[in-house]
Amino acid sequence: MNEYIDKTYWIAVAHLPKWTTERTNRFIIQIIHENKMSWADFFELDKKGWKELFAFTEKELSDLEYAKNDMPRLAFIAEQLQNEGFQIIPINSSDYPVVLKENLKIKSSPPVLYIKGRKGLLQEDAVAIVGSRKAGAKALEFTDHVAKKSVKEFKVVVSGFAKGVDKQALDSTIEANGKSIIVLPQGILTFQSGFKKYYEPIVNGDVLVLSTFFPKAGWDVGLAMARNAYIYGLAKEIYVAESDSKGGTWEGVIDGLKRQRKIYVRYPEPKEKNANLKLVELGALSVNMDGKIVASKVMPSKELFEPVSKNEVKEPSATYEDGKRDIENDILELLNKGTYTTKEILLALKLDWDSRKLTNFLKKNPNIKVIAGKPAKFTRNDLISPSLFG
């Protein structure tokens, strides 16, 4: 198949209207990996065919039909991307950065990356340096120090191409002859002035430009906020130069802390007005101007991320027990290995149940996912296809 035709399908799938990232990723797993279909084969089907084979909602069927009818327009965009030297990296590609999947999981990993530059930078250890657009002198000095320190350690610096900290991180990295990834808050085809400005480092393989949004999408506040998760997701280390108590940097750090990420925040000077100390209270690690961990006088707060209290009464999860045998556990252990029909489960576990009883149990169990088809198959709800999220 012509390469840009295949990429056309990926553009269509990645930007289905109002589909969440998780829903899109589960759709990709369902079609590509569970059903072993190509996108060409899938879109050969009509609405009736999709309805017979898959458990799509009416809205999803309409969205897929719209995407199918939109293919001619998307094909022109795919061809333009190819002709202008852009690359499209789908989530099932070996070029897709493993660290992004590890950090964002199936829920938030973008289905497609649009890039320009040396794609090998996506596989190198990376450091994110983030902060306010209106950062003070100390924050910019910190950014400069951490960027140049990262270059000496042969790490890629990831930033978001906003004013303030982002721009300082990029400029300091280039000045030190380092490598950088720019994560855009817009479609990659709308960044023409940036490509002209950074033409030389891009061509030399020192700068890679990346977007996850529709190629022709203009800059947007919502996209800028969404982009922050990808900056954090691409990095193994995250440094915060300066944060307000709201906005993109703050939201990104809070999200990172909830994901149990280690986040390093510059310890502010006494008269500075920012939310850096509050982030330390919430569990971030305080660092000095050189990015080295320092003892903090602020005690971490336990409000946001406190585990369930020992005194809290929790209703135990129900299990199906047959004599001394925990059948539910046996079924879940089997489903850890892959997908099975009701008949295959009965045979593998030698259960003294009829098919209807087992099917009812499987459909009602919150840990089990139903894969539509004839016959239906079952797997663990939290089981992620190793070829996508290994």
Q: Can you describe what each PLM-predicted range is?
A:
Residues 1-93:
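Short, small/acidic-rich helices and loops at N termini and domain boundaries
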